[in-house]
Amino acid sequence: MQIYLDTANLDEIRTAASWGVLSGVTTNPSLMAKEKGADFKATIQEIASLVDGPISAETTALDADGMVREGREFAAWHPNVVVKVPSTTEGLKAVSRLAREGIRCNVTLCFNAIQALLAARAGAFIISPFVGRVDDVGVDGMDLIREIVQIYRQHRITTLVLAASIRHPRHIVEAALAGADIATCPFKVLEQSMRHPLTDIGIERFLADWKAWQQGK
């Protein structure tokens, strides 16, 4: 399973990229809004220079014509740009048109399996089910991932399943077990994923033993 970072913060992306684990980056209007004074185009292009993989840039238009217009513009910024559109009927229209032009799309804000199936039929490159938000309404978000994966495999659909709205490291593990192709997570969650108290204790013990051995020579 591939790991993407869900952020528009360049410092976070540089740091995570240095760990050698990133396969892509996802952004959205809310994440961009956190980067005060940043230029959208320049930010996406800088991200593409830091991570050699799909970079999702989301449209803000609500109609298909607007999404297509923005999507074409975004795709011209860098070959790795993937255009994010919402799981709506207008979004499906836009995906269908953009896909015919060879522009890859990430259909976002997916909350049920039928949305995922229709997005794939329209030509989506990626579908993004929101695990955490589904959990918030009392439904198991990982069940949604499993349903989509099963449908796609049964019908030999090549659209990639990206687990989004990841809240904690366990979500990443569960997404991998459920068969997701990708998990995208905030920097904080990715950083937490490599922390374990027993790892810290083990390092301290090894260093203490090494120091004692060196002093005893």
From Swiss-Prot:
The gene is tal. Gene3D superfamilies: Aldolase class I (3.20.20.70). Keywords: Cytoplasm, Pentose shunt, Schiff base, Transferase. Its EC number is 2.2.1.2. GO terms for molecular function: aldehyde-lyase activity; transaldolase activity. PROSITE patterns: TRANSALDOLASE_1 (PS01054), TRANSALDOLASE_2 (PS00958). GO terms for biological process: carbohydrate metabolic process; pentose-phosphate shunt. It catalyses: D-sedoheptulose 7-phosphate + D-glyceraldehyde 3-phosphate = D-erythrose 4-phosphate + beta-D-fructose 6-phosphate. Pfam families: TAL_FSA (PF00923). It is an enzyme of class 2 (transferase). GO terms for cellular component: cytoplasm. Pathway: Carbohydrate degradation; pentose phosphate pathway; D-glyceraldehyde 3-phosphate and beta-D-fructose 6-phosphate from D-ribose 5-phosphate and D-xylulose 5-phosphate (non-oxidative stage): step 2/3. Transaldolase is important for the balance of metabolites in the pentose-phosphate pathway. The keyword Transferase applies. It comes from the Bacteria. The active site is at residue 84. This is Probable transaldolase. InterPro entries: Aldolase_TIM, TAL/FSA, Transaldolase_3B, Transaldolase_3B/F6P_aldolase, Transaldolase_AS, TSA/FSA_arc/bac. Belongs to the transaldolase family. Type 3B subfamily. It is found in: Cytoplasm.
